[in-house]
């Protein structure tokens, strides 16, 4: 199974974008969850505006689907500036980055998603731009080549990544603000589902919102996607009204259990129990057993399973916890 094809994948899909733009909060006061990040950013933004400075460069990291792009857009809105958006894989040439930097207005935001995938050549251009607001450009070729410096207006670089550890130290050290986004609580996700339903003019009960939230793996992107699929079911089965019963039936149809697991999650956990006697099992063996890339397991599947206490990542390998045995109705084996 391709990770992006899963209904509970936290990776953005093309059909998510239009709806996400419609329901995405624009200001910090509408931003639900991440209380520490929100309170810190309120102070940092207000201070920058009082000093009439650009906000310090900001690195946002955490699992996919938690709102890194949303937060970047909120920062630009709160600062009252424009935002230019790109991603690490798109910036193939130094000239691509130079063109974006030279078109920025004072205090504008340049948002680079997947910043850990920048090439070394692009990073070399970024260093003086971030530190001194200067751009070094090579003119000519061969022996006649020379470097010229261009002054840039003060700007804010916001980098987003799911793999902060993959950033080089020189790049990471140039971010004055670093924020980690955590998985959301069920209470916060319930609020997000209710807010999204209101934006989409949907009728949904409080307990139905809670039902969607608790199966959303702590991730707003998944919650909003599940809400749209539950809406489809409600339109056909209940004249559009989303009750708890309708939500449960829709999610059962989608094969999403009460822990928010789909077939792939259950396959990973059951493989550890059945094929490897509960673990420990190495990542390569586990990837081969379930037919997925090791990066998919490490970056997409594991964070939620570990955070929820279903999986342990140890130096000797992955181990299924007693909670996993109970989830599969194998509580007796938890004491082996």
Swiss-Prot record:
Region (Head domain (RuvB-H)): 258-336
A molecular-function term among this protein's GO annotations: four-way junction DNA binding
Coiled-coil ranges from the UniProt annotation: none
Enzyme class, first EC level, given as a word: hydrolase
EC assignment: 3.6.4.-
Binding site for DNA: 294, 313, 318
Annotated residues for binding of ATP: 23-24, 65, 68-70, 131-133, 174, 184, 221
Subcellular location: Cytoplasm
InterPro entries on file: AAA+_ATPase, AAA_lid_4, DNA_helicase_Holl-junc_RuvB, P-loop_NTPase, RuvB-like_N, RuvB_C, WH-like_DNA-bd_sf, WH_DNA-bd_sf
Pfam families for the chain: AAA_lid_4, RuvB_C, RuvB_N
GO BP of this protein: DNA recombination; DNA repair
Disulphide bridges, residue numbers: none
Keywords for this protein: ATP-binding, Cytoplasm, DNA damage, DNA recombination, DNA repair, DNA-binding, Hydrolase, Nucleotide-binding
Highest rank taxon of the organism: Bacteria
Predominant location category: cytoplasm
Record remark: domains: Has 3 domains, the large (RuvB-L) and small ATPase (RuvB-S) domains and the C-terminal head (RuvB-H) domain. The head domain binds DNA, while the ATPase domains jointly bind ATP, ADP or are empty depending on the state of the subunit in the translocation cycle. During a single DNA translocation step the structure of each domain remains the same, but their relative positions change.
Role, per record: The RuvA-RuvB-RuvC complex processes Holliday junction (HJ) DNA during genetic recombination and DNA repair, while the RuvA-RuvB complex plays an important role in the rescue of blocked DNA replication forks via replication fork reversal (RFR). RuvA specifically binds to HJ cruciform DNA, conferring on it an open structure. The RuvB hexamer acts as an ATP-dependent pump, pulling dsDNA into and through the RuvAB complex. RuvB forms 2 homohexamers on either side of HJ DNA bound by 1 or 2 RuvA tetramers; 4 subunits per hexamer contact DNA at a time.
Record's subunit section: Homohexamer. Forms an RuvA(8)-RuvB(12)-Holliday junction (HJ) complex. HJ DNA is sandwiched between 2 RuvA tetramers; dsDNA enters through RuvA and exits via RuvB. An RuvB hexamer assembles on each DNA strand where it exits the tetramer. Each RuvB hexamer is contacted by two RuvA subunits (via domain III) on 2 adjacent RuvB subunits; this complex drives branch migration. In the full resolvosome a probable DNA-RuvA(4)-RuvB(12)-RuvC(2) complex forms which resolves the HJ.
Protein name: Holliday junction branch migration complex subunit RuvB
Naturally occurring in which organism (per UniProt): Actinobacillus succinogenes (strain ATCC 55618 / DSM 22257 / CCUG 43843 / 130Z)
Gene (name only): ruvB
